[in-house]
UniProtKB/Swiss-Prot annotation:
Organism (species): Chlorobium phaeobacteroides (strain DSM 266 / SMG 266 / 2430)
Binding site for carbamoyl phosphate: 55-56, 105, 133, 136, 261-262
Source taxon at top rank: Bacteria
Gene: pyrB
Protein name, as recorded: Aspartate carbamoyltransferase catalytic subunit
Gene3D superfamilies: Aspartate/ornithine carbamoyltransferase (3.40.50.1370)
Lineage, broadest ranks: Bacteria, Pseudomonadati, Chlorobiota, Chlorobiia, Chlorobiales
Residue runs in coiled coils: none
Gene Ontology annotations of biological process type: 'de novo' pyrimidine nucleobase biosynthetic process; 'de novo' UMP biosynthetic process; amino acid metabolic process
Membrane-crossing residue ranges in chain numbering: none
Oligomeric and partner information: Heterododecamer (2C3:3R2) of six catalytic PyrB chains organized as two trimers (C3), and six regulatory PyrI chains organized as three dimers (R2).
Pathway as given in its UniProt record: Pyrimidine metabolism; UMP biosynthesis via de novo pathway; (S)-dihydroorotate from bicarbonate: step 2/3
Length: 308
């Protein structure tokens, strides 16, 4: 395994291998003074982020340092990209500095796959346009696996702007591979065409999705959708598709809740649902557990691509 640009064609055994290795790292991370073998001591990893990021960038940096690697932090606004340098030239110049891998966040779909044709080094997709975000999906699956033991037969629905979501796409591919039952819940204007061809259930009624599901992955609503003709208003979206305590209490169904962040509080999810880590109540938020698990999962990815 040389690159991780998506989960669309990643076989079951590779996903399971990454999740199993992440579990080993997570066990050590839980100790008071976690210590890891510096398996990547001589490696240099370029964190090339052409879009803003908090959780993904910092967790990759922490993951690399736990394994002994050094990181080069790249931001487009403070680089020669702002002077017109092409993506290809940027990658070639970083490779000339003898980096061993690229972690790429880019606004264009397919950018990570494009870069694999430019460099001989390993490429990890940290989110490209509306294409894929494989490490986010891996940490989501890892988090659910911690709670349920397996994703086989698990009912999981993804709520929100599916059409523009790279997180949704990677989760659909990965969870179907692991045997989960996947559903989408969204206004019809924010559903991509052809999803029903994958054997995915579609809900346009949030109450019905909650009654069906064991867990929900809530997506950040990109606020510009309200002015782009996709939604009547943010308020209308919150009424019909916002995950709230009141809705869960009315249905009386306990739900595990995930969200990739950042959160639009009181739009796609209420603060009470987002912040409740455990009962009482009809939901348990796994949001911060996802962030913690992101380190272990990204350690597993770096170890698999660079140390084996």
């Amino acid at each position: 395994m040389k690159h991780l640009t998506g989960l669309c064609e990643l076989p079951l055994y590779e996903i399971q291998r990454l999740l199993d290795l992440a579990a080993v790292f997570k066990k050590e991370l839980r100790t008071k003074a976690p210590a890891f073998a510096p398996t990547l001591l001589s490696k240099k990893i370029a964190l090339a982020f052409f879009e803003n990021s908090t959780r993904t960038r910092f967790s990759f940096e922490i993951a690399a340092k736990h394994l002994g690697a050094s990181t080069l932090n790249f931001t487009a606004s403070s680089s020669s990209v702002s002077k017109g340098e092409t993506l290809g030239d940027t990658i070639k110049n970083l490779e000339a500095m003898q980096v061993d891998a690229f972690v790429i966040r880019h606004p264009s779909s397919g950018a990570a796959d494009l870069i694999t044709g430019i460099t001989s080094k390993s490429v990890i997709n940290a989110g490209d346009g509306s294409h894929e975000h494989p490490t986010q999906a891996l940490l989501d699956m890892f988090t659910l696996k911690e709670h349920f033991g397996s994703l086989e037969g698990l009912n999981v629905f993804i709520l929100g702007d599916i059409l523009h979501s790279r997180v949704a796409r990677s989760n659909i591919f990965g969870m179907l591979t692991l045997g989960a039952n996947v559903a989408l819940c969204s206004p019809s204007t924010l559903l991509p065409p052809g999803t029903s061809d994958l054997g995915i259930r579609i809900f346009t009624d949030l109450d019905q999705a909650i009654q069906w599901a064991d867990a929900a992955i809530v997506l950040r609503l990109q606020l510009e959708r309200a002015t782009g003709g996709y939604l009547p208003s943010l308020g209308e979206y919150a009424v019909h598709f916002g995950l709230t305590d009141e809705r869960l209490e009315r249905i009386r169904k306990h739900l595990l809740v995930l969200h990739p962040g950042p959160i639009n509080r009181e739009i796609e999810i209420s603060s009470r649902v987002a912040d409740r880590m455990q009962p009482p109540g009809f939901s348990s938020s796994l949001l911060l557990q996802q962030v913690t698990n992101g380190i272990a999962v990204r350690m597993a990815v770096l170890q698999t691509l660079l140390a084996e």
